[in-house]
Design a protein with these regions (language model features):
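A cross-domain feature marking catalytic cores of carbohydrate-active enzymes
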Residues: 13-15, 166
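A short acidic, often aromatic-flanked loop/helix-cap motif at beta-alpha or helix-coil junctions
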Residues: 18
Length: 199
């Protein structure tokens, strides 16, 4: 017999689900630029050099628990009581040692699916909504995706082979503020981290 196969995109046109459950949007850790302190305080703009249509700082989870500030001159982690994040400005202020260099590692939501963004830029798509991501390991999203796939299989009994492709958790594709590839890692799982998973 002839096998009929078809691809389906689980996330395609599912922005409504992701918007209702922002805490279950995919995340990755980002690291700020290295900045040298000129005095006893320093402000670092976290999203400098990152594409803000693709990534958004995670302010839902406690920065003091999930972020890390490092004095790159000494290699020491800066205590959490020595820094504060100003959500309105998107800057983190640190009590510093003059002329020491600092970075911030922080969580960010992937608010534009990187594969979709890549195709959007490469193919010069117009009038196409940015596709949001969501993390299928999180409880509500996991159930939603299982239900959606089950219904699709029931609605398509004539299909006997389903091929899954482009599991984004398998690689990382991060763009800079000029829509260029800033960080690409095809064999890692950098974009599959979250407080839920780290717990």
């Amino acid at each position: 017999s002839i096998r009929r196969q078809r691809q389906m995109c689980i996330r395609d046109r599912d922005n409504a689900w992701a918007m209702k459950h922002p805490e279950e949007i995919q995340q990755e850790y980002l690291i700020s630029n290295r900045i040298t302190a000129r005095g006893e305080t320093l402000r670092i703009r976290l999203m400098e050099g990152f594409h803000t249509e693709q990534l958004k700082v995670n302010t839902l989870d406690d920065p003091k628990r999930w972020w890390e500030v490092i004095d790159r001159t000494t290699g020491e982690v800066v205590p959490t009581d020595a820094w504060e994040f100003d959500e309105a400005s998107g800057e983190l202020e640190i009590r510093t040692i003059p002329y020491h260099e600092y970075t911030v590692s922080f969580l960010a939501f992937l608010i534009w699916d990187p594969v979709h963004m890549y195709n959007f830029i490469t193919n010069d798509w117009k009038d196409t909504p940015h596709q949001l991501t969501y993390d299928v390991r999180q409880p509500k999203t996991k159930q939603y995706v299982k239900d959606k796939l089950r219904k699709w299989c029931e609605d398509n009994p004539h299909i006997d082979v389903v091929r899954f492709t482009t599991f984004f958790h398998q690689f990382t594709l991060t763009f800079d503020d000029k829509k260029r590839e800033k960080y690409v890692e095809w064999f890692g799982y950098s974009a599959s981290v979250s407080p839920y998973i780290l717990e």
